[in-house]
Design a protein with these regions (language model features):
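Hydrophobic h-region of N-terminal signal peptides that target proteins for export
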Residues: 21-30
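Intrinsically disordered, low-complexity segments enriched in small/polar residues
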Residues: 30-125, 130-382
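Bacterial N-terminal signal peptides that target proteins for export
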Residues: 2-18
């Protein structure tokens, strides 16, 4: 099922298109040498790579960063009850402006690709494509990076389903502390197609092996293991249940523990710098990066990001070839290609740049000043 990029909802919630583009960028640097840009936000460098089996993680560190404490993450907000997520069409209770009485509102019939979100906190909510919310009629993932302002009207939220076999009332939506692995996240963030999201959930990895690549060992996470997990523990094809199942979850856990141990060892001696992101390679191919505006923000996402990278690594063939630091620096150059923007004035701007097989996506907060909260670069698999 293809999802429409723009829709009209209820009482006229509008999407805005912005003509401007994000101006904050990141420039690669040699280990130990600050980046070439003079701006504080460009002052970062790559540490030595952390490698385990077919996964290589290049830590990105910075001596400067933005204060991001004003922003609320999905996990924080759901755990504290500062946001409410409901199925579209369910009665949603909100307070009117004078806060004297509740006002019931409905937003049409339930929809696979739409939820309703209310930000009741005093902080803007940051959402990343691929973050999972569990419950409702089926588990969903956030469709696109965005910011939800505090005190806003109930928001029709674009999502993708990652539980193909269920459409029935379940528990209230809750924090899953999960972001789907890159093969699934790409389908949401770039391709924006529900059928492709469903297919990628049970495919493991959708990356295709290059004909020029050297011979590789079979993936540790086989199609048979995924099918067994679906058969025995995840009959509704729930992403969360598949990748936390006995057939798969144990392998992911041990993989994550070893990478985390090596990562901590590499980053433990930092003085005056913080890890703000990572560049990810599988075998010799640099494939992915997530960089944040501050070390604090990176820390909040790191555990679930690492698990997502590990799932992808286990689903890909094991190649002996390793990516170099120069490969990672080249991968992080600012792209020069077709640009697409979306914006909510005074709240956020979303920018995508496409060049060849690469996509760069930036989420800018526009208040209290313009900063790039998150920057994603990925090598598309199709």
């Amino acid at each position: 099922m293809d999802r429409s990029l723009f829709s009209l909802f209820g009482h006229g919630v509008l999407r805005f298109a912005a003509l401007g583009v994000a101006t904050l960028g990141f420039v690669g640097s040699s280990p130990g040498i600050p980046a070439g840009g003079a701006k504080p936000e460009d002052d970062w460098r790559l540490l030595e790579p952390v490698t385990y089996e077919n996964l290589t993680v290049f830590p990105v560190v910075s001596a400067s960063g933005h204060d991001t404490r004003a922003f609320l993450t999905l996990e924080e907000a759901l755990s504290s009850g500062e946001i409410i997520v409901r199925e579209q069409g369910a009665e949603t209770i909100v307070r009117n402006r004078d806060r004297n009485r509740p006002v019931p509102r409905g937003y049409g019939a339930p929809s696979v690709n739409q939820l309703v979100l209310i930000n009741r906190s005093k902080r803007p909510l940051m959402l990343l494509a691929g973050e999972l919310v569990s419950g409702g009629k089926q588990d969903r993932i956030i469709a696109k990076d965005r910011i939800v302002p505090p005190g806003a009207e109930p928001l029709p939220l674009d999502v993708f389903c990652v539980e193909h076999g269920r459409w029935s009332n379940g528990a209230q939506f809750s924090a899953a502390n999960t972001i789907v692995h890159p093969s699934v996240r790409e389908q949401a963030a770039v391709k924006q197609n529900q059928s492709d999201v469903w297919a990628s959930v049970t495919a493991g990895s959708v990356a295709t092996e290059s004909l020029a690549a050297p011979p590789a060992a079979a993936p540790r996470m086989s199609a048979d293991a995924i099918n067994e997990a679906v058969r025995t523990e995840a009959p509704t094809q729930s992403y969360n249940k598949i990748y936390n199942s006995r057939a798969i979850g144990g392998s992911v856990d041990s993989f994550v523990e070893e990478v985390q141990r090596r990562f901590r060892r590499e980053t433990s001696g930092l003085k005056g710098e913080r890890v703000v992101g990572v560049v990810i390679a599988y075998g010799g191919e640099v494939a992915w990066s997530d960089i944040f505006a501050s070390g604090e923000l990176f820390d909040q996402y790191w555990n679930k990001l690492l698990r997502s990278y590990a799932v992808e690594a286990l689903a890909r063939p094991t190649l002996r070839e390793k990516a170099s630091s120069e490969d990672a620096r080249e991968f992080l150059r600012r792209l020069n290609g077709r640009e697409t923007t979306e914006s909510e004035p005074g709240v956020y701007r979303w920018l995508e740049i496409s060049e060849g097989s690469l996509s760069q996506i930036e989420l800018d907060a526009l208040q209290p000043k313009t900063i790039t909260l998150h920057r994603l670069v990925l090598r598309r698999t199709s």
